[in-house]
Amino acid sequence: MGQKKKKLAKGRLDKFYYMAKEQGYRSRAAFKLIQLNKKYNFLGTAKACLDLCAAPGGWMQVASKYMPVQSLIVGVDLVPIRQVRNCIGLTEDITTQKCRTEIKKALKTWKVDVCLHDGAPNMGTSWVQDAYQQAELTLHALKLATEFLTTGGWFVTKVFRGSDYNSLIWVFNKLFKKVESTKPPSSRNASAEIFVVCQGFLNPKRIDPKLLDPKFVFKEIQEVKKVDVLSEKKKVNRAGYEDGVTVLYKKGFISDFVNSNEHLQDLANFNAFEFDEAAKIFEQHELTTPEIKELVKDLKVLNKNDFQKIIKWKKAMAAYKEKLDNPDEEETEKPEEKKELTAEEMEENLQEEMKEYLALVEKKKRKEKKRQNELKRKHQRKIELTMHIPGDKIEETTDGDLYSMKGKDEFDEDIVADHSDISSDEFDSDDSDDDDDDDNNGDSKLIDDDEYLEQQLDEQYKLYQQRIRKKAAKLDDVKVKKDKIGQDGYNEDDEEFVEEQEESNPLLVGNKRKEPDAQAVSSLFFDNELFGGVEYRNPGDSESEPEQDGDDDQDDENNKPIDISKLKKQKPQAAQPITKKQKTTNSAEFGKQKSKYQKNPTLDDKDDQDDDDDKGNSIKGFEEVPVQEEVEYESDSDEDIDDKIKTKALGEFLIRKKSRQDLIDDSFNKYAFNDTGLPNWFTDDENRHNKAQTPLTKEMVDEIRRKIKEIDDRPIKKIAEAKARKKYRLGKKMEKTRDKASSIVDNPEMSNREKSKAIEKLYSGTDKKNMKPKKIIMIAKKSKTAGGGTGKYKIVDKRMKKDLRAQKNKLKTVGRSKDSSKKSKPSGGKNKK
């Protein structure tokens, strides 16, 4: 049978434990009260609350959060409670009169609307005693609640399921209108606790003291048996001695006891056994020990174990006697004689054994190979799903290996062997680190064991950062490609086609051409023949270079591929000074692109900056001048809108003195720490997760978002003026058209048909040829072919679009030449009437 698993402490660290840590609650029990309040909503309208057995203060935090502002909250416990905002903590015993006095001082003339109780006694004795102490503590809490609860108040308490549970429910029903038992989801299933919510305190003028007395409430009720007068009396049959027995002490013989099949009855009837002449063979047997001889002398004083020994000895003696009585029937086992094998048979046996052994070895190899392939497949799957980071593995070592520097090289080799599927960049970084370690091998022996472990953690964290940096670089490449597609004139459908083409098969990494980084592009750019005669200047030269103003453009060019053929065709030009207008234009464009691509800085920005500083400030003779920080222009992204909402809400908090002081007080919290010497991986994780909660409600955020939307939807002044002018011109035109139409209607010389045609032509404004709808030209997708159609849209490719544009321009020039020739000819012909 397997051993029973021992319950460990880490098994109790469930999701509510970590949620309490993240949200700043002092215990996971806070979520029990949150879920109870969500179901019954007793904290939303409460103005005063009394929390009994409140340590460490988790329920007080929840009450302060969900109760109205300026509510009175008092917490009582035997253990001192750390200060909770807007709460009063008392260190008293709820069973004493002193506790009642202190609560009255804290409440003054108030009556509480809600009384909470989440206390439990010291557990660890028997379950019956623990359950009784919990029920008794709940009754004391109820007694205290009846003194301070207002009419219609709530009482929420924790109760253990047990024999006293029904008694407590009976008492609750006497004092409250409605009593319900529930178990919130945050309460562990293994726990026997349940929560009783009592609603509508009756507040009677006089409460019977017996209702709150544990001795009376938990007293066991004994049912009184009813006396049956008509019951018949049963006559007891008394058993006497056996007939003809004159002596009560009986002795038996061992020979009869061994031969008897009813030995249990003999042990009950006889007081002792004697060894007679027939039992000499049993007395001399090796199993007949002095203990057996003493046991059979007095059978009435033996216990169960002694009787078992006698019965076991009796069976052994019976088998021994049967063996002596039938000696001829014993079959002697004779070993079989081994046949001598010939040389051929031995050779065949050897061949068969070899085949079996080879088959077994081959089977083990196949099994091991299958296991290795399965492990590799799982490992690769984890890497693809970003569930596992290469190099992020804790090696299991013994205590001797952990605290010694022996075998460090073998340990590093094992790490490299385990992570054979790491990319080439990671191998290069690992090799460089190993070379540095080999150079300083003599100094490494002096390193402390703790420092060695910290170095190992730092190396693992570097691999993790490289992984994040590569993912961020891929996202930047996708953004740059989108911009290139937009500059070439593609529409939104083409952008979606490019994204689908790139994301269709992310595993085919080898087929994609890697984009050149900034250093490779700059080296390729400066190796051109155009810069053959340029003289380089040192940073210390006093003369200023006009090219320094163009560094911003150079940074932008690093993100774009350079066409070498165009550079060769260009002629070298003399350096010209850049005007002030060009400087402002360049800086504005750089600021826009910077706000677009660096709006969300990653954790690796700081590391990239440090790496750039270590590399130096020159590339092949050219000095890299640090770019001044540009102002990031605002964008309409969701993150900027959230920042606006947060800023506006904090500004509203700063208007009033009380809210401003509360905001300043909240800034002094557990998140404000300034410890030095912490590792990078710890500080990065703290900065990402360990943040204080902003005091914003959902209603406040919705209201601010609505105001910002109203401001954004408001048109600018120029657009409003243009719309007004357009509306004014349209009104004037319609008024003029109405006047003309009325004059046509009043004309008596025109027939009704002529009038209708004239009015129709007047309102149409132009003839039907100009009113013919034009076809909208669309560029075909790469997945579609260009072709004609009779619908609203005409699908063309780039070449057809350019041809159509050229054809239209040619027709325009032909029309202009015809018009000029017509104007040169003298007018003639008949005039139309």
Curated annotation (Swiss-Prot):
Region called Disordered, residue ranges: 323-349, 363-453, 475-640, 730-767, 779-833
Main location: nucleus
Residue stretches in coiled coil: 336-386, 455-485
Similarity remark: Belongs to the class I-like SAM-binding methyltransferase superfamily. RNA methyltransferase RlmE family. SPB1 subfamily.
Entry's Gene Ontology molecular function annotations: rRNA (guanine) methyltransferase activity; rRNA (uridine-2'-O-)-methyltransferase activity; rRNA methyltransferase activity
Bias (Basic and acidic residues) ranges: 382-396, 475-486, 557-566, 732-741, 751-767, 794-806
EC top class named in words: transferase
Gene Ontology CC entries for this record: nucleolus; nucleus; preribosome, large subunit precursor
SUPFAM superfamilies reported in the protein's UniProt record: S-adenosyl-L-methionine-dependent methyltransferases
E.C. code: 2.1.1.-
Keywords: Coiled coil, Methyltransferase, Nucleus, Ribosome biogenesis, rRNA processing, S-adenosyl-L-methionine, Transferase
GO aspect biological process, one term: maturation of LSU-rRNA from tricistronic rRNA transcript (SSU-rRNA, 5.8S rRNA, LSU-rRNA)
Function description: RNA 2'-O-methyltransferase involved in the maturation of rRNA and in the biogenesis of ribosomal subunits.
Biased composition (Basic residues): 363-381
Name of the molecule in the record: pre-rRNA 2'-O-ribose RNA methyltransferase
Gene designation: fsjC
Catalysed reactions, semicolon-separated: a ribonucleotide in rRNA + S-adenosyl-L-methionine = a 2'-O-methylribonucleotide in rRNA + S-adenosyl-L-homocysteine + H(+)
Residues holding S-adenosyl-L-methionine: 57, 59, 77, 93, 118
Record field: compositional bias (Acidic residues): 423-441, 490-503, 542-556, 605-614, 626-640
Protein location: Nucleus, Nucleolus
Positions of the catalytic residues: 158 (proton acceptor)
Organism listed in the record: Dictyostelium discoideum (Social amoeba)
